[in-house]
């Protein structure tokens, strides 16, 4: 599948995500270099390397994709700060098969001085396949 032009990846930022993905996020108009990206739509297409023995996406891949999305949302796409996951709880609700397009729109429920609380669902079409709640530690760039 070729993703629309308004989606991109961030190769080189996280080697583990590069290896497992590619994971995509939707870009916004970046003609204003001072604008902070606030668009939080993420997606990936299930390839054979993402699947278990049942040709369904492996749960670890779903967890990694959710972590990719929630950290980018919590850290405003790493334009202002970075973060690390300190807590992650999830529920597997349905399978997703080879070729499925999985999307996520994480919700940043609260930010404190050092933490962000993020939740979300991974979707295939209109169905939820996975839900999560997470806490991340917000960190300044070095």
Question: What annotation goes with each model-predicted range?
Answer:
Residues 1-142:
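Terminal targeting signals and extreme-terminal segments of soluble enzymes
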């Amino acid at each position: 599948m070729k993703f629309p032009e308004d989606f991109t990846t961030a190769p080189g930022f996280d080697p583990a995500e590069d290896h497992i993905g590619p994971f995509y996020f939707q870009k916004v108009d970046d003609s204003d270099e001072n604008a902070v990206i606030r668009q939080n739509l993420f997606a990936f297409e299930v390839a054979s390397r993402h699947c278990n023995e049942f040709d369904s996406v492996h749960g670890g891949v779903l967890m990694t994709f959710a972590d990719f999305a929630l950290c980018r949302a919590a850290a405003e796409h790493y334009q202002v700060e970075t973060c690390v996951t300190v807590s992650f709880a999830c529920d597997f609700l349905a399978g997703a098969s080879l070729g499925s397009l999985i999307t996520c729109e994480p919700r940043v429920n609260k930010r404190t001085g050092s933490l962000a609380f993020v939740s979300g669902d991974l979707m295939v079409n209109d169905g939820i396949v996975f839900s999560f709640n997470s806490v991340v530690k917000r960190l300044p760039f070095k």
